[in-house]
C-alpha cells in the first residue's frame, strides 16, 4: 500500500510534538503493511506545486495529517488548502483520508470539501461533534503522540518544575519570566533558533520582519534547555514533578509520561477537549498565569490514583484505536473508487 502524506509537520522548526506525531504515524502505516512514498510539508501550498507532485499512478492512498490546521477556515487559507485534497483524490481516483485532526470553528465550505474524503478521524469528541453538525461522521482517536508506549513510569524519581512556551508569544514571555522568578527551567517546544534569512531573502521586507520578530522573541524568552531530539524533550518532561505549559503537545507528552501539569489554553480549545475525553475535566486549566509556583502549588497538583487510572485507561484505548484506524484506512487503499 503506497501512501502519500500531506501536512507533514516534522519540518515545523524542530517542533518536538510534531516530530513524534510523524514518527508514530509512519510507524503505524508500516506496522500495518503500508509504505510512505511521498511526504508534502505543512508550509507549502500543494496546489501551486504541480510539478512537485508524485506520479499518482504510483500512489494508493492520500493521507492528510490534520493536527491543529483545520480551524477557523473562513479566515485561514491553510485549512481550505488541506480540505481541497478531497477533490484531488477524486480526480485521480485515489482514496483520501483525514487523520489526527482537530476541527474547530470551521465554515460550511470546509465541510463540503471534507465530504469528498473517504473517511475522517479526529483527535477528540468535540471535533467529532462539530463534524456531525455539518452532516459528517468522524472516528475519534487521540493524538498520534500517544499511539505508542513510552518507557517511563509514574514511580520514577522526579524533581523540579519545567515550563514550556505557548503558541501565543505574549504568554510565552510571561511563562519564561515566571520560570526565572521560580528558579525553574524553561524549554520551548521547538529545537531551532531563528536564523538570518540570507542575503537573497533580505530583499523581501516581509522575510526580514518575520526574522526580526522571531529573533526578538528568542531574546525575550530564550530557552534554558533546547534539545536536539524529541526523545530528549520527553525525558526532560518525564523528569519533572510539575510542568506548566501553553502547548497542546506538551500536555500529550505529560499524559504519555504521567507527569503532573497545569496548562493555559492554546489557539483553540483543543487541550481542554483532550482532557475532557481523558476524564480529567477542566481541573488543570489555568485562566491566569500564577504569581508564584511554590511547594504548596506543586504538591496540590500531583496526580491522584484516580487520575492515574483514567490516564492509563485512556492511553490503552488510544493505542488500540490508533491501530484500528491504521488498519481501516490502509484497507481503503486496496480498492480505488
Each predicted region: which residue ranges?
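Active-site anion-handling motifs in enzyme catalytic cores
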Residues: 1-337
